[in-house]
Amino acid sequence: MTIHLISFASLLHKQATLRSSHEAILSELEKYYTVKLVDYQDMDKLTSDDFKIIFIATGGVERLVIQHFERLPRPAILLADGMQNSLAAALEISTWLRGRGMKSEILHGELPAIIQRVHILYNNFRAQRSLFGKRIGVIGTPSSWLVASLSLIHILTLPPKR
């Protein structure tokens, strides 16, 4: 199970120190997943089958992230460990994304809670990927005694595989 962390860090922050600066969260993630740090400039090399999290490593990256808005994974899962003002940047970015109709979520807080949420998001991602290309349908109509179910009937359209 691999997580691709698309890292955004301030130009003032040396890329070489990114790992050591965020050792606590990266080590915890590596207990459960293979973690690959991907520079934001290389995010186009990832495929639609790769589970991606946007890693806000420092503050001061808000403009950089929005410049790459079209290339960001959807929904946007933002990971911020609070180091180097990353949480403030993640909050700004999330607000901007939501203002443009893009779903986003910030992962921040106690490490066990972050890991638990990543597990859920990863499993949801895998389930959604397994449904792409599948034909899903309902045969017949609900029985008349299922009065609440009648209002829930609708056609489910899955987005095309990216």
Stretches found by the model and what they are:
Residues 1-91, 98-100, 116, 120-123, ...:
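Metallocofactor- and cofactor-centric catalytic cores in central/energy metabolism, strongly enriched
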Residues 44-48, 148-153:
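Solvent-exposed, charged interface segments at domain starts and junctions
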Residues 82, 107, 141:
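Glycine- and other small-residue-rich loops at beta-strand/loop junctions that grip anionic moieties
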Residues 95-107:
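Conserved thiamine diphosphate
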Residues 106-115:
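Glycine-rich beta-alpha loop elements in corrinoid/cobalamin-binding modules
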Residues 110, 121-127:
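Beta-rich, aromatic/charged-enriched effector core domains that present basic-aromatic interfaces
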Residues 126-152:
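Conserved anion/nucleotide-ligand pocket segment
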Residues 153-160:
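Conserved small/polar residues in nucleotide/adenosyl-binding loops
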